[in-house]
Amino acid sequence: MHEMKLDPLPFKMIGNGEKTVEMRLFDERRRKIKVGDMIRFENRESGEELLVRVMSCDVFPSFVELYRAYSKESIGYRSDEVASPADMEKYYSPEDIEKYGAFAIGIELIK
């Protein structure tokens, strides 16, 4: 079982089925994630938890390529929002993105 924390909005979007792809840095911790694994997401603010199953794992050189491969809704944007790979720099430094690359985790909500 893998465990990850999420901000409230992406947590809500996964919970209601809107967000089906979680984006992370492809670092040492994420390299252990495989199709069929379970991930427990914890809401950073409320402590609520969601359980998901990993349905797909895709690695990209950067978030630019990842964003091109998925619909903006599936990665957590609303249809009226502009999806920008630069948004990921809120979470990861450009140096780390270049070093590790981007990881798209296709997920299915269990509970």
Predicted regions and their residues:
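Short conserved beta-strand and strand-loop elements enriched in small hydrophobics
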Residues: 36-44
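Contiguous surface segments at macromolecular interaction interfaces
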Residues: 65-111
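Short, solvent-exposed beta-strand-terminating loops
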Residues: 57-67
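Compositionally biased, charged N-terminal/linker segments
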Residues: 1-35
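Short beta-strand-centered aromatic/proline hotspots
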Residues: 48-59
